Regions:
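Polybasic, lysine/arginine-rich low-complexity segments
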Residues: 585, 601-603
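Proline-rich intrinsically disordered regions
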Residues: 596-598
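N-terminal secretory signal peptides that target proteins for export/translocation
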Residues: 1-6
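Cleavable N-terminal signal peptides of Sec/SRP-targeted secreted and luminal proteins
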Residues: 8-25
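GH16 jelly-roll
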Residues: 25-580, 587-590, 607-617
């Protein structure tokens, strides 16, 4: 083949390139959001600013999936949950859109694990019997300051304990359930140099170095704002409160915490030994009160100097049965402090009614601050023996097994627990607003004042499971198998090619072209963040391999053609016969290795996924 003969190949190569690559252009606002909801007014009367929509997901498109790499907004994790005495495994198969809602299903499903016992230092086979889902916008969409509103129907039955639905925000430096990323980072919101505390805060204000783009002498962390954690169970009088189950908990979790004379669980705190100034709703019909059942956790480490206290400033408000049968709204209004750490507030509302508020000055007892970190959104249903299960453990019961249908476990389960499955947590929308011309309100996961990108890049294993190639896979734009265009979202979203795979139109992405693409219109980006101009382009692996093979073949054949042409001319001058040369291509080889990222040492049992065949059935 002569060089001229490659023109048709190059032509078809360019056509294929144009068909396979699409610049993904869209804002984070879902086109399905009605125009009326593009702006909102704050419910806090002292806030006179105008707010505009910066992010939304209406979940109108049925069939969306959230496996790592499937969706630009959300990642449904696929891993065991190490935290909070969890009884569930998180699977991306338990999250999808249907009938105009995001459906997070919680089902009975056996998952086998190779567990590690920190006391005996030995591995053993273990199982979990519940499967659920958690969706995160971690390192995809983050924001600092603004208004977040959800509409959701809670899962299960209001009078049956065990399910733990939650809608919450977390600082981008920690990835929820990846315990290696949260240790010494969660839930710090502290920017003072305290020599006694610096060893337990990884990025502290005593440090003069600015590794990973961090500013020197600046404390960083991953605080948590819980918009709703719903507690179901039998309606009975609870100690130290007039609130009964079911109820909603609204919390700010920060560190460092109160170290001495801490409140006793189930009792109100002593005056002067806990935070003060928080505002509650005193209306009898919608009354909210301090949550006496959760004041935070102690994160125990060795040596003792590394142990630290995390505090939860939490309030409860009662719910009725309608929260489990139809949609209700949950809102938080969050204003970060000024650059000096002073001020700021968080205010919670349910169905437009005030529930609870925390101001910056309410945190003075420890010196922590209202969060100013870029935070991401989390939606999940957990099942944990620490949430809604019998406390204390009933007499004569070991409370060590929680399997439905096993007579030995029945005593440890809440009444009616096994009838809760399957349960559906249905979310109608997520909408996030920010104030116009407010410099404290920024978009992006690695903003200029509080960057995260280089730190995450430098500690990737903390944000990964064993076998992962990277924390987040690039978003697939098309490529799913199809038989008709309807399989690819219809003509508006994409087409089904003659070869039987989806090709997405601009502004749509995901393997079946079902998700609206997204990008930041006014992103705050750290100068230390390395950006690549084509970051929003996805190259399928098969396409990359094809390009490499075509390029190698083109170069080899072109060089051989030139060589043969030169030899042919020399032989003609010498009167020799023409030469027929053949090129033999040697196969290339590659190695794909990955390291297993074990969670840090804890005083709890931690797990890693193994082949189910290794677990006795």
């Amino acid at each position: 083949m002569t060089a001229r003969g490659y023109c048709p190949m190059i032509k078809w190569f360019l056509i294929g390139l144009l068909m396979s690559i699409h610049m993904i252009r869209a804002s984070w606002v879902d086109p399905d959001t009605p125009e009326y909801y593009k702006t909102t007014k704050p419910m806090y009367r002292e806030d006179k600013r105008q707010y505009e929509l910066v992010f939304s997901d209406e979940f109108e498109q049925d069939g969306r999936t959230f496996k790592n790499g499937d969706d630009p907004r959300w990642t449904a994790i696929n891993k065991n949950d190490y935290t909070n005495e969890a009884l569930h495994f998180y699977s991306h198969d338990n999250a999808r859109t249907m009938k105009g809602y995001l459906n997070i299903s919680t089902t009975q499903q056996i998952n086998g694990y190779r567990a590690f016992n920190e006391k005996t230092k030995k591995f053993y086979a273990d199982k979990k019997y519940i499967q659920s889902a958690m969706l995160q916008s971690w390192n995809k969409f983050c924001f600092t300051g603004g208004i977040v509103e959800f509409s959701a129907r809670l899962p299960g039955k209001p009078d049956v304990g065990g399910l733990w639905p939650a809608l919450w925000l977390l600082g981008n430096l920690a990835r929820a359930t990846y315990v290696g990323s949260s240790d010494y980072v969660w839930p710090y919101s502290y920017n003072k140099c305290d020599p006694r505390k610096r060893v337990s805060q990884e990025i502290n204000a005593c440090s003069s170095v600015n590794h990973y783009g961090m500013a020197p002498f600046t404390g960083r962390g991953a605080p948590e704002i819980d918009i709703i954690e719903a507690m179901q169970g039998e309606k009975e009088k609870l100690p130290s409160t007039n609130i009964t189950r079911p109820y909603q908990s609204c919390s700010l979790q920060v560190a460092p915490g109160v170290e001495r004379d801490r409140p006793i669980l189930g009792l109100p705190p002593k005056q002067g030994h806990w935070y003060s100034g928080m505002e509650y709703n005193n209306d009898n019909a919608t009354r909210s009160e301090l949550n006496p059942f959760f004041y935070g956790v102690t994160l125990v480490h060795t040596p003792k100097a590394y142990t630290y206290q995390a505090d939860a400033l939490s309030a409860n408000v009662g719910l009725n049965a309608s929260f489990y049968t139809r949609q209700h709204t949950y809102r938080v209004e969050w204003d970060p402090p000024d650059e000096d750490g002073i001020g700021g507030y968080i205010r919670w509302y349910t169905n437009g009614v005030f529930v609870y508020s925390i101001k910056g000055e309410d945190l003075n007892i420890t010196g922590s601050e209202i969060p100013s970190e870029a935070m991401y959104v989390i939606m999940n249903t957990a099942v944990a023996s620490s949430w809604g299960f019998p406390v204390p453990c009933p007499s004569g019961c070991t409370c060590e097994c929680f399997e439905c249908g096993n007579p030995d476990c029945e005593c440890a389960l809440p009444s009616g627990y096994c009838d809760n499955f399957p349960a559906a947590f249905e979310i109608d929308y997520v909408r996030i607003y920010q104030a116009k011309n407010e410099p404290k309100h920024t978009l992006g996961c690695s903003p200029e004042r509080k960057p995260t990108a280089l730190f995450i890049e430098g500690h990737q294993k903390r944000y990964m499971e064993g076998g992962d190639r990277r924390p987040l896979e690039p978003i697939r734009q098309g490529g799913a198998f199809c038989t008709k265009t309807a399989d690819c979202g219809g003509k508006r979203h994409g087409i089904c090619s003659d070869r039987g795979f989806c090709i997405c139109h601009d502004n749509y992405t995901g393997p079946m072209c079902l998700a609206h693409a997204g990008f930041y219109e006014n992103e705050s980006i750290s100068e230390n963040t390395i950006e690549f101009g084509w970051a929003n382009i996805y190259f399928p692996k098969s396409f990359v391999a094809l390009i490499i093979l075509l390029a190698i073949g083109f170069l080899v054949s072109l060089l051989e053609t030139v060589r043969r042409h030169g030899r042919h001319q020399r032989y003609q001058k010498l009167g020799g016969p023409p030469v027929d040369l053949h090129v033999h291509k040697m196969p290339t080889s590659y190695q794909n290795s990955s390291d297993y990222a074990l969670p840090p040492k804890q005083k709890v049992v931690t797990y890693c996924v193994i082949d189910g065949r290794l677990v006795d059935q």
